[in-house]
Each structure stands twice: as C-alpha cells, then as structure tokens.
C-alpha cells in the first residue's frame, strides 16, 4: 500500500482512465489519462484551481495508461480532512495531533474539504474538454 495516498475511485469515462486519490495531507487529487505527453500548462483546461500535474503516476495507483494530467484540492480555498487521513492509515495519531494544531492556525481552517464526488465530477469535466478539443482539431 502507498503510505502517501489511497485510490478512492478509479473509473473510465469516454475512454479515459480517471483516478481519484486521497493523500496524507488530507486532500484529494484527480487524474485523467491523455494520449500525448504535453506539460500540464500546455492544456487549455478549466478545472478546480487549474491543472497542476502531468506525467506518470505511482505504480500502485493502478493506472491503466502511461501519461496523466491532474489537479489537486490542496489550495488556500480548500480544507483538509485529517480524520480521514488517520482512518486510511496515512498518518499516525501523533502526526494527526500535530496537523490538527497547525490547521487551527491556518487560513484554510474553515474552508470546505472537496468530496470524492466533487473530484470525480472535475475529472469528467476535464475529459469533456479534452474530447471537445479533439473534435475541433479533426
């Protein structure tokens, strides 16, 4: 098991492999497979706070393709769910207490934690934009 993150959901949408993970820092990320190896900043894609990843994923994410683009929900407008990180075994009790103390002082303290459903919808939104771009290039 990857001690940095767990895969909460993996699904196929319009031929793209989509992976939603929850990480040890208490927030989710979403990844979508792509056929090209462009950098994330070369895409004109709207999603939660913009794309922040392009590349290969860790082997234990169970990826079905080679290259992915993705986004994270670890921004100033996002909250952290350290309870879930503890439940998933991504952090221990000591780290949980440290993070909780720091969180109270953080500007993200009262921000919403992005749900699995939200991340799934953002992945679909990315795919829809990729497909629309492919149609206009044909």
Can you describe what each PLM-predicted range is?
Residues 2-50:
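Amphipathic, interaction-prone secondary-structure segments
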Residues 9-12, 41-138:
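Polybasic, proline/glycine-rich intrinsically disordered low-complexity segments
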